[in-house]
From Swiss-Prot:
This is Ubiquinone/menaquinone biosynthesis C-methyltransferase UbiE. NCBIfam families: MenG_MenH_UbiE, PRK00216.1-1, PRK00216.1-3, PRK00216.1-5. The gene is ubiE. Disulfide bonds: none annotated. It catalyses: a 2-demethylmenaquinol + S-adenosyl-L-methionine = a menaquinol + S-adenosyl-L-homocysteine + H(+); a 2-methoxy-6-(all-trans-polyprenyl)benzene-1,4-diol + S-adenosyl-L-methionine = a 5-methoxy-2-methyl-3-(all-trans-polyprenyl)benzene-1,4-diol + S-adenosyl-L-homocysteine + H(+).
Amino acid sequence: MVDQEKETTHFGFRTVAKEQKEGMVAEVFHSVAAKYDLMNDLMSFGVHRIWKRFTVDCSGVRRGQRVLDLAGGTGDLTAKFSRLVGEQGEVILADINESMLRMGREKLRDKGIVGNVSYVQANAEALPFPDNYFDCITISFGLRNVTEKEKALRSMFRVLKPGGRLLVLEFSKPLLEPLSKAYDAYSFHILPKIGELVAQDAESYRYLAESIRMHPDQETLKGMMADAGFENVTYSNLTGGIVALHRGFKF
């Protein structure tokens, strides 16, 4: 008898068919797109700006280079990279979610950030770019929402130039137990209430909190990047390990 069971994955704490997750995540981000920047500031007390600034500082991006801001959303990193690469460089803001991509495009154009930025709707698991194309790739608070993380990392490796680097900024595992307990209390009790009050959507922010807990910890993600082909993989814990920045190179 042929096994008819479907492959499964997690959507927050729920187990769902792999083929369903992409659509379910899409609905979350369609729902939160309009209030995404405001909620980021409220949820992190503005600290997400420091985490992103650190990521840019670690990128090594220079004038004339080509950068992929994957899962770039509303374009915080793209705006910074646009200034660094200058007129001769290029930044591609890619996101699988049409609503997030539209918000990012409108936000950056309103700020006058045009000319060296383009926008592509793309799935991280099958990036529509040539081999050895980018000098630097960043994915900020996006990898945990990808169904096949290993496949996405291999796709990023393929389109990165030799000598290029990948930076993964993502929520991770707090280093100290007291911080972990306080973080859990905030994430599961306060965060959904903020989502309900500000975005009229407690459920999406409950999923976001759950997705953080299901994401690989620092050492596991380091190993996954190495398995995908990246070398000299390291990470920096930020805010006590609530967030980590992983770096890997293609040689």
